[in-house]
């Protein structure tokens, strides 16, 4: 369960209040969508939910976020610069201690991503936006997780992948 109490988030650059006095409890198994216009704090709220102790230079906040230290999946809007320079081989196999390979290959098949590419030396930076999202979904969902945080998951997504994601979220 995740519990948010009296959370107010302020953007420190322009002192704009992004979230005001939010109170929310998310029960185990519950699905929540954060919907709003661009630039109004959805990603900032999500970043704090993923890591309430994170120091975010552009934000200040008051209130409490309580959540267990259970494993989680976080797929940001854009893949980080540090991951862009990795090869697919390194991305999928350099840190494998908790990967479930059966799930990894099943997800690759379901998302129409050729699993033979896992071992390639292709740089992540050369992938299309949709392929970058697919590799994140494949790898992260093949790890143990109790929470899944997706930031703008439909960006760069083709119709087939969007349909897959909707079905995944429903079940």
Please annotate each region the language model reported.
Residues 1-4, 8-22, 28-30, 57-60:
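A short, flexible loop at the N-terminus of ABC-type nucleotide-binding domains that lies
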Residues 10-12, 70-71, 76-135, 139, ...:
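ABC-family P-loop ATPase nucleotide-binding domains
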Residues 28, 68-70, 143-145, 171:
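Short loop/turn elements that form and flank the Walker-type P-loop nucleotide-binding site
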Residues 29, 36-41, 130, 151-152:
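Conserved phosphate-binding and hydrolysis motifs of nucleotide-dependent enzymes
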Residues 31-37, 43-100:
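ABC ATPase nucleotide-binding domain signature region
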Residues 148-152, 165:
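Catalytic Walker B motif of ABC-type/P-loop ATPase nucleotide-binding domains
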Residues 152-153, 158:
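Walker B catalytic motif
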Residues 162-171:
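Helical segment within the ABC ATPase nucleotide-binding domain
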């Amino acid at each position: 369960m995740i519990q948010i109490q009296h959370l107010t988030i302020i953007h420190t650059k322009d002192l704009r209040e992004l979230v005001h006095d939010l109170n929310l409890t998310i029960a185990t198994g519950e699905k929540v969508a954060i919907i709003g216009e661009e630039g109004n704090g959805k990603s900032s709220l999500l970043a704090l939910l993923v890591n309430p102790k994170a120091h975010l230079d552009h934000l200040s906040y008051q209130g409490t976020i309580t959540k267990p230290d259970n494993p989680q999946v976080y797929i940001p809007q854009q893949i980080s610069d540090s991951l862009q320079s990795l090869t697919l081989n390194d991305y999928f196999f350099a840190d494998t201690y908790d990967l479930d390979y059966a799930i990894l290959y099943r997800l690759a098949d379901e998302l129409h991503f050729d699993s033979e590419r896992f071992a390639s030396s292709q740089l992540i930076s050369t992938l299309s936006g949709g392929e970058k999202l697919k590799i994140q979904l494949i790898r992260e969902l093949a790890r143990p997780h109790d929470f899944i945080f997706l930031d703008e998951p439909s960006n760069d997504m083709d119709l087939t992948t969007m349909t897959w994601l909707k079905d995944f979220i429903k079940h």
